[in-house]
């Protein structure tokens, strides 16, 4: 990918040069007749000495956070059997940069938010560090340091890293994301396309303060997260970086963007998303304490009702009024769903007071509760509505994950 990017940059340079030369040729042709007569009167062009105060709220905000935004470098084992095309289409997997025989697989961004003794803590996206064999963090001053993983949470796509604080100058501060306003300035700071563009800043506004965004994880499961929407330019490599307000406070951790419509027919601009700072602070505090996030689990494998064929749906004998829900594919022995009497073929339509039309709805409803809470689950069996009081005594770490269907 690095080679492809350089090629594009060079091509842009050539086109720009051609335009400049063309303009020069036109100017000369229109002034040629008087050139000889005016040579004695020509004067050289000079740079103006007038100074301009360029300090603004934006430049001040960027200055406050720039030293705390870093590049995160993910090294993985080199796959010698991979195609030569992987260097073009596989991110930085073809990079010559390596450490201890490992290959630089990808790069993202991160934010230093805390110093404690000889350590400093960095928050980034989980997908930035996924699959790593080794991690480096490139500081704003150019120093590259080793990083270790304190903890991560796939569901919220957040991770906490620990590095030496020796060269750390500043740490970022978090704003209260519950007080954000649509239309207020938003600035993204990170490393788009990798560390060669480290500490790139782009400016926009907050387009929305709360959006439900559906993410597809590497294992195929989908999750719903709450996100801030912005039109500040966010590109590959910005993941894990800072979205800041006009005071230089972090209001979100940049995470994703929409580039095309779902069917790929229309390109999209200005739809970037960040995890709100209040959610970030809640998760990183738990990751620092426990290294993981414990969430309640039902103990089922499931499939969305909408994904079943007409023939399969008819066998469930559902009333015509039931058009959405989650079909229990199997029940794991010893977990809450089994203890409450749920069986394969049941169709869950509600958890507590929250309607469930998909697996992401079920996850969102379930994860709003704590372990050992008791919730009422509404489901259909043989066409009849039933309820079960389910004690959420187990966590997601107790789940079997070998099935291709979603688990919870």
Swiss-Prot record:
The PDZ domain extends over 302-383
Q: Return the similarity comment.
A: Belongs to the peptidase S1C family.
The protein in question is named: Serine protease Do-like HtrA
A biological process term (GO) from this entry:
proteolysis
From which domain of life does this come? Answer: Bacteria
The transmembrane segments are 6-26
Cite the CDD domains for this sequence.
cpPDZ_BsHtra-like (cd06781)
Q: Mainly resides where?
A: membrane
What InterPro entries does the record point to?
Answer: Chloro_Bact_Ser_Proteases (IPR051201), PDZ (IPR001478), PDZ_sf (IPR036034), Peptidase_S1_PA (IPR009003), Peptidase_S1_PA_chymotrypsin (IPR043504), Peptidase_S1C (IPR001940)
Q: Which GO terms describe its molecular function?
A: serine-type endopeptidase activity
Any single Gene Ontology cellular-component annotation: plasma membrane
Phylogenetic classification of the source organism: Bacteria, Bacillati, Bacillota, Bacilli, Lactobacillales
Q: Record-annotated residues binding substrate?
A: 237-239, 298-302
- Gene disruption phenotype: Inactivation leads to growth thermo-sensitivity and reduce the efficiency of secretion of the recombinant protein produced, although the protein produced is completely stabilized. Cells lacking this gene show an alteration of surface properties.
The family database entries (Pfam families) matched by this protein are listed as: PDZ_2, Trypsin_2
Q: How does it sit in the membrane?
A: Single-pass membrane protein
Task: Indicate the residues that form the catalytic site.
Answer: 127, 157, 239
- State what induces this protein: Induced during stress conditions.
Q: What exactly does this protein do?
A: Degrades abnormal exported proteins and responsible for the propeptide processing of a natural pro-protein and for the maturation of a native protein. It also plays a prominent role in stress (heat shock, ethanol, puromycin and NaCl) resistance during active exponential growth.
* Species per Swiss-Prot/TrEMBL record: Lactococcus lactis subsp. lactis (strain IL1403)
Which reactions does this protein catalyse?
Acts on substrates that are at least partially unfolded. The cleavage site P1 residue is normally between a pair of hydrophobic residues, such as Val-|-Val
Gene3D superfamilies tied to this protein: 2.30.42.10, Trypsin-like serine proteases
| Listed EC numbers | 3.4.21.107
């Amino acid at each position: 990918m690095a080679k492809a990017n350089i090629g594009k940059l060079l091509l842009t340079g050539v086109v720009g040069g051609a335009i400049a030369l063309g303009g020069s040729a036109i100017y000369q042709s229109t002034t040629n007749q008087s050139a000889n007569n005016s040579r004695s009167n020509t004067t050289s062009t000079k740079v103006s000495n007038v100074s301009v105060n360029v300090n603004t709220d934006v430049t001040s905000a960027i200055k406050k956070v720039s030293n705390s935004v870093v590049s995160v470098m993910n090294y993985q084992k080199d796959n010698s059997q991979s195609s030569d095309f992987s260097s073009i289409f596989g991110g930085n997997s073809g990079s010559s940069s390596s450490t201890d025989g490992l290959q630089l697989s990808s790069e993202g961004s991160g934010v230093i938010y805390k110093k404690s003794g000889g350590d400093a803590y960095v928050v980034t996206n989980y997908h930035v560090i996924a699959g790593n064999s080794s991690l480096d963090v490139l500081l704003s001053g150019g120093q590259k340091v080793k990083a270790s993983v304190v903890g991560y949470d796939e569901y919220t796509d957040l991770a906490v890293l620990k590095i030496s604080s020796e060269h750390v100058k500043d740490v970022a501060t978090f704003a209260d994301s519950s007080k954000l306003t649509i239309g207020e300035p938003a600035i993204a700071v990170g490393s788009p396309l990798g560390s060669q563009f480290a500490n790139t800043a782009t400016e926009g506004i907050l387009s929305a303060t709360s959006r439900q965004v559906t993410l597809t994880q590497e294992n195929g499961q989908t999750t719903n997260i709450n996100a801030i929407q912005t039109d500040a330019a966010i590109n590959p490599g910005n993941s894990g970086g800072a979205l800041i307000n006009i005071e230089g406070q972090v209001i979100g951790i940049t995470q994703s963007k929409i580039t095309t419509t779902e069917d790929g027919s229309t390109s999209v601009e200005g739809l970037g998303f960040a995890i709100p700072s209040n959610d970030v602070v809640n998760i990183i505090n738990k990751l620092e304490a426990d290294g993981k996030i414990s969430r309640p689990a039902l103990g089922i494998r499931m499939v969305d009702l909408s994904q079943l064929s007409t023939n399969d749906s008819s066998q469930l004998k559902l009333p015509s009024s039931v058009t959405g829900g989650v079909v229990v594919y199997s029940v794991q022995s010893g977990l809450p769903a089994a203890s409450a009497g749920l069986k394969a073929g049941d169709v869950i339509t509600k958890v507590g007071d929250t309607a469930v039309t998909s697996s992401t709805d079920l996850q969102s409803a379930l994860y709003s509760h704590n372990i050992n809470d008791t919730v009422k689950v509404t489901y259909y069996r043989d066409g009849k509505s039933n309820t079960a009081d389910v004690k959420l005594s187990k966590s997601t770490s107790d789940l079997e994950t070998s099935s291709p269907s979603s688990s919870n």
